[in-house]
């Protein structure tokens, strides 16, 4: 079952950075790199979601996967399609499977602080919150008040704020496509 899945050994510390990455951008890379350095992780796995259950639609998977590969630099950053390979749509399913597939590996879930607003909408969010340590990396527009509802045992990493967002990138792309071409 581990064939074509990322390599990890007992004792390793792996950050799990899941997302739609629609598209991936420098802000995503900043979150992953901050967690890698500040948490002393051996690797960060970018888990490209087949389809975010909280979003109506996403760009094609291959396009999003490639955009993540273009942002994840260095040998310690691993972009993977393991959720698609395993057929999972929800984080709790992924965490259950990874704990069985990789005994002795210490996983930490990484997310930008902007994801806190929707965390309680995740399927089995309580299970996710208790399954592994969760590291929250600061993001623009998310102040300390947003963190108040999050469990105290989570790890909060304040870092330089990176203003780019996938939503803004998609909006600019749509606007550029909608502009009439001059002859």
Q: What do the PLM-derived regions correspond to, one by one?
A:
Residues 1-183:
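Nucleotidyltransferase catalytic core that binds NTPs
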